Amino acid sequence: MDGKEFQALVEGARSYRRYSGEAVPREELLALIDAARFAPTGNNTQLLRFRAVGGKEDPAEARQVFSHLHWAAALKDWDGPEPGERPGGYIAVCLPTSVSSNPVRLLDVGIAAQTLSLAAASLGLGCCMVKSFDACLTGELGLDRKGYDIVLVLAVGPRGEKVVVEPADPDRGLAYWRDDEGVHHVPKLPLPSLLI
């Protein structure tokens, strides 16, 4: 992969919030986790743990996770994907309860999440990092009994919406938005405005 191909992969690894509704096989979720295990962590602690949820093997568990997620705060009139548009599986990113709010460990979570997202994009899958979820999800999946907290959930599935990256418009701001055709627009600042 050359630099242009990598740039295209990063640009394609957007937050997808609508999916085809097709379940993701557990082996594909595990392949994403396998990529994330190579991501760097502070002091090489490797404290992150992952839970592959739902997919073809457990649609009931996927519905359970979905019921605890809160989607797209910037889209005020949208309550999340409808049946038939929901993710095909999930990956819960977990930390030991004793360090689940440690800033360095949360950096590890972000690095792993981006790795998972890029791995999903490389397989043609959409992914969305969801931080807004009900705290009881950790207990419902039995992870609290193992001493872990869910700190991030990644929704994964075949893409079911068009996402367009476009130059930021100063009059519109940086919030993502949907047009009348349902196309999801993601404004991005130009490179010169990021350099200081």
What residue ranges belong to the model's regions?
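Acidic, surface-exposed loops and disordered segments
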Residues: 1-196
